[in-house]
Amino acid sequence: MRKILMFLIACVAVSFTASATPSWEINSKGAIQWNVDKAQLPHKDHVEMSGELMAFVLRWAINADGVLDLDRSLVFPMLRTIPNDTHASLMHRLNTDITSMVSVEEKSLYNEATKFVEIDGMFRVVSIFDEAVEVERIIFPSMDKPFMCERYVLKNLQDDEVKVYIPEFKQNITTLPECGVDGSYLISASIQGAGTYKLKSGESLTFDAVFQACRLTEAPQVADVDAEYAARRAFVENDIDSALILATPDQVVNTMFRYAKIRASESIFKTSGGYMHAPGGESYYAAIWANDQAEYVNPFFPYLGYAVGNESAMNSFRHFARFMNDEWKPIPSSIIAEGKDIWNGAGDRGDAAMIAYGASRYALAMGDKTVAKELWPLIEWCLEYCDRKLNDGGVVTSDTDELENRFPSGEANLCTSSLYYDALLSSAYLASELAMNPSVAKDYRKKAETLRRNIDSYFAKEMYEYDTYQYYDGNDLLRSWICIPLTVGIMDRAEGTIEALFSEYLWHKDGLLTQQGTSTYWDRSTLYGLRGVYAAGASDLATEKLKYYSHRRLLEDHVPYAIEAWPEGSQRHLSAESGLYCRVLTEGLFGIRPTGLRSFELKPSLPSEWDAISLYNIKAFGSDFSLNVTRREGGKLEITVTPAGGAVKKYLIRNGQSLKVNL
C-alpha cells in the first residue's frame, strides 16, 4: 500500500501553486487590499454582506482605464413576495452612479482613477478625480435596519480652494401590489448631506447615499450613517475580533479565518419567526436548512460565543423540533418564509442525521445543561428516526443527500450514515451529562460500534486502486464525500481515502471536484476534506492544501470568502461555508471534539513547518479559555490551557496523540 509520505511527493504532479504576484495583499491593518496600479485590468468581482434586515451583493468592476462601476443587488428578506416560497425576498438591482451627480469646480465627478480596493467587513475604495480630489467610498449594511449605506469622503488634494456641489437626490421605485405579500413595496435611494461646499487644501467633506425598502404604507427612514458605521465596526471589532482568535505562522490562514468568522456570523436575519441564520446568495433568506444551519454552522457558534449566532442556532433547532411526529415522517429539509412554510422538494435528504449531528455537538459545546435538556427530545427523535431507516446492510437510507439529486446518491449514502454515527457518540456523551440511566449512553455507543462496522462492510471499496469508499452501493466514480468518515473519527481507510481525495481524479485548482470526471466543485466538501485530513494526522498535506485554498479564496480572483459552488450560483458567498472553514481549524488543526459540557478531546495535528499554534478566547464549554500548542524536543507537543481568571494547565503529548481536557 502506498504511504502518505510517498503520496505527498506524488501530489506535486496534480498540485497548483498560487500566483507569484497575487492581486490582493494583506495590509498593515490586517485587511485585504488590491492596489489597482499593480493589477491587470479590467477586473470584476462580487461580494455579499448582510445585516439583520437586509443583505446585498455588490458587483463591482474596474475597467481598463481604472474606472470603478458598482451594481447593487439589494435583498430585503422580511418584505415577502408572491409566491411566498424559499426565494420570495424582495430583491432589486440598482446601478445608480452617485459620484457622477456630484460636481467639482463645475465638472462632473466622473471617471475617477481607482487607487485601491479594501475589504474588511466593509467595502472601501479610494480613487482620484482629475488629480485634484480624493474620493473615498465605504459601503456596508446596517446591522439592524433595512439600509445599505454608502459613505463618500471627498478630500481636496490641491493647494487652491475647490467648490463641491452635492445634489439633492431621491429615487423611488414602487413594486406592483399583486407581487407582494403586504402589497406594494417602496425601494428608495437618496443622498444625505446635499449642499454647496468650499474645501481648502487638505480639507474633507462627507456625504452619504442610502438605499432602503419598506412597505408602501410606511415612510422611508432618515439614516444616521455615523451610528450605522459605528455599529458595523463594533460588530467586527467587538463580536468577531475579540473572540476565537487564531494565531499560526501563516498570515493568510489567520486572516482567512478572521474573515470567515465575519461571513459566518453576519448572515442572520431578524424574522417574525425569530433570528434565522441563512445562506444568502440572492436566493436563500429568512429560512433554515438541516445541512447549512443545523449541520454546518450551528456547531461553530459556541466557540465564537456570538450571542446572536447562538440565538439563531437555538431558534433553528426549535423550528425543526416543531415537526417531530409519532408517525416518523421526515422532518422537512428547510423551514422557509420566516418559519411559516416548509420545503421538502428533494424528499428525505438524511436531514434527521444532519440535525442530530449538529444539535448534539452544539449542546455539548455550549456547556449549558438547560440548553442540552431542551435539545435532547429533538436529538433523541432524530436518532430514533435514523435507526428506523436502517436497511438490510445496517446503514441509513434516504431519498437523496444534501446535493438534492444533482449527483446520484443511491438508496443509502456514506454521508448520512457517517453523520448518524457521530451523532450517536455525541448523544452518548450528552446522556451521561444529563445523568440519564447509564443504559442510554451504553445503547448509543453499541449502536455506533455496529454502525461503524456496517459502514465499512457496505461502503468500503477499492476505487481506482485506492482503498477507500464507494459513496453508495454501485457507485463506480470517486466522490469528494468519501472524506466524511475521517471527520467523524473513522480512520479504517484513511490512507487510501486521502490519496484518492488529492489524486488527479478529484483535486482541482479550486478544491475537490464533486465527482470524478466533472468540473463541478462545492466548497463544503473541500472544507470537510481538509478537516478530515487533519483529523487523520496527515498534517503536512492538510496544511499545504489549506494554505493553497486560503490564498485562492482570500487573495486571488474572487474574494474574500469560501463559496458555495461552481458552475451553479457563480461562486456565491454562502454564509455557512465560512463556518465550515473555521471548523477546519478548530476541529481539524486543533482537533477539538466535545465530550461533555465542560470537557473535550484535544488532538492537535501540528505540521512540521510550524512550531506553534494558538487559539485565544474560546467561548465554548461554558468557559472562556485559550489553547497554545508548542513543539518541544523529542517530537513532543506542549499543550497550555489558559482559562480566563483560572489556573493554567500544561500537558506534554506526542503529535497526533489525544488529550482529555476538563475545564
Predicted regions and their residues:
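Terminal accessory carbohydrate-recognition/targeting modules of carbohydrate-active enzymes
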Residues: 19-255, 305, 538-541, 550, ...
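Active-site core of glycosidic bond-cleaving carbohydrate-active enzymes
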Residues: 289-314, 318, 377-380, 404-405, ...
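The feature captures the catalytic groove of carbohydrate-active enzymes
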Residues: 198-225, 282-286, 332-354, 384-449, ...
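Short amphipathic alpha-helical coiled-coil/interface segments
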Residues: 257, 261-264, 441-459, 549
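Bacterial Sec-dependent N-terminal signal peptides
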Residues: 1-21
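Alpha-helical junction/boundary sensor with strong preference for TPR arrays
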Residues: 324, 366, 383-386, 390, ...
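Proline-centered turn/helix-capping motifs that create local helix->coil transitions or kinks
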Residues: 268-271, 324-329, 387-397, 457-464, ...
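Substrate-binding groove/exosite segments of carbohydrate-active enzymes
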Residues: 237-373, 400-404, 472-488, 502, ...
